[in-house]
Amino acid sequence: MAIKTENFILNIGPQHPSTHGVFRLRIVLDGEVITDLEPVFGYLHRGIEKLAEGRTYLQDIPFTDRLDYLGSMTNNHAYVMAVEKLAGITVPERAEYIRVILDELQRIASHLAGLGFFLNDLGALQTPLLYMFREREKIVELFDMCSGQRLNYNYYRFGGFVQDLPEEFLPALKILLDTLPGFIDEYEQLISTNEIVLIRTKGVGVLKRDLAINSSAAGPVLRASGINWDIRRNDPYSIYNRFEFDIPIAKNGDTYDRYMIRILEMRQSVWILRQAVKDLPEGEIMGKAPKLLKPPAGEVYSRIEGPKGELGFYLVSDGTDKPYRWRVRPPCLLNLSALKDMVVGWKVADLMAIFGSIDIVMGEVDR
């Protein structure tokens, strides 16, 4: 007599230590093998886009801090750049260099946190995370020097910055740039030579090139699948066209490659930072921008390469001091949409390793 079996539906979350926020995964299992996955989000929805339409352009800057709250500086940059484009505001040379410095520091800090949490998801509880937070703490202290905040910095302004870098910032940054490459090498050696990490990541959770494109994957997730796409190089903004750097690309699109891309990107960020510090000019840090901004009627889309991928802002102005439409293109949500293609066919034990490798923040997914 044939045995009749049924697939098992398993809910992981919405309150689970590995979901990186309040998030639910609804998975269908055939034994231990995943046959289907549905990400269920919205638990952290705050209505940021609608709230922003009821406030002035300046009052909306703090909302950007609370999207990917591990990438606040780059979020600020993407938004103020969109408003500057809409209003025709010019940014001074020194301010552009400072923006590059802060963006690349934010990229390193975000990758350090992402890799630490990824290893937590693999089962290497706390120790690697604390190693990486040791270096991230030095970057957070630099952000604290210039903004007065350790999180949600609210430092960028239309036309530049409200205040210049403090005197102690650059000496502390130079010390960090001297020591950080050695620690990145240490992290790579500890992780890439660990047999358990290799077994659980190499060839696991592959996102093929065509699926990465079709799902609009972004950032390290996209480049790990062999797509040479980075806004800093493909559509340069700010002054990124003045710097020499490489775009790390992998070819397998597996969990290991997504980890490795972030290691390589941190090295490139250090190289960009050294060039920016060396060439940082003197001068004004704030362009001419009215205190009450009323951009002419029109629309604009502006994008940057954030730590998680292409972050864009679409703004519509009706000529008043408040945006008529305020829309975010969130890379975390786009990468999350590719998760099903990565996990189907793998065992439920591999799910969190694959999920951790895409490095999402639910504040940006739900908004």
Curated annotation (Swiss-Prot):
An annotated GO cellular component: plasma membrane
Any GO molecular function: NAD binding
Catalyses which reaction(s): a quinone + NADH + 5 H(+)(in) = a quinol + NAD(+) + 4 H(+)(out)
PROSITE patterns hit by this protein: COMPLEX1_49K
Principal location: membrane
EC number(s) stated in the UniProt entry for this protein: 7.1.1.-
SUPFAM superfamilies cross-referenced by the UniProt entry: HydB/Nqo4-like
InterPro entries, per the entry: NADH_Q_OxRdtase_suD, NADH_UbQ_OxRdtase_49kDa_CS, NDH1_su_D/H, NiFe-Hase_large
Known role: NDH-1 shuttles electrons from NADH, via FMN and iron-sulfur (Fe-S) centers, to quinones in the respiratory chain. The immediate electron acceptor for the enzyme in this species is believed to be ubiquinone. Couples the redox reaction to proton translocation (for every two electrons transferred, four hydrogen ions are translocated across the cytoplasmic membrane), and thus conserves the redox energy in a proton gradient.
Family of the protein in this entry: Belongs to the complex I 49 kDa subunit family.
UniProt-recorded name of the protein: NADH-quinone oxidoreductase subunit D
Organism: Dehalococcoides mccartyi (strain CBDB1)
Lineage: Bacteria, Bacillati, Chloroflexota, Dehalococcoidia, Dehalococcoidales
Protein encoded by which gene: nuoD
